[in-house]
Amino acid sequence: IVDTVLDHLLKIMDFLACNLDSEGGTGCLRALYGDWNDSINELGGTRDPGKLFGSGVSVMATLHFYQNCKEMAAILKKIGLHKEKAAGYSRYRRQIEAGLFQYAIDRNAAQERRVVHGWGDKLSYKIGSWRDPDNRARISSTSHAFWVLSGMIHTDVTMRESILKAFEQLDSKYGL
């Protein structure tokens, strides 16, 4: 059997959709083995016996999937195929939006906002937050960048100031 490019893309989307966090209730994409950023490689793990992965999430990967849902729905509409899948991708986007707004935006005591890089199993800790597991505040450039690149910024334009402030804090003589 030879798959088309479209078949391949649909299989990827199905795989990602099957890995949205339903158990933890965040609706975001579980980290599994991690993403390219070594700082979150353990986010997908769990201490639960018999389970390979937990409910830890990569915000960057979630935002990739969020963007892919929009793009795939547009492709399917354009070619007039898989209307049910296109509708599903729109539902996933709404689910992801709700989850990201509830869990990915971290606030400090002054109510300043930051987009975290991710969180561990059962929201046990966050990375790129105002208070990481080592009690240090960190800023993740990738989660903030993908908040903009994925179009998530259009769902709440007030995040613009928070994102600009995060990048200003990351700016140094060595770059971001």
Where are these regions (language model features)?
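Active-site acid/base region of carbohydrate-active enzymes
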Residues: 1-57, 84, 88-119, 165-176
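Aromatic- and histidine-enriched alpha-helix N-cap/loop-to-helix transition segments
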Residues: 4-7, 53-67, 138-142
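Catalytic cores of carbohydrate-active enzymes
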Residues: 64-176
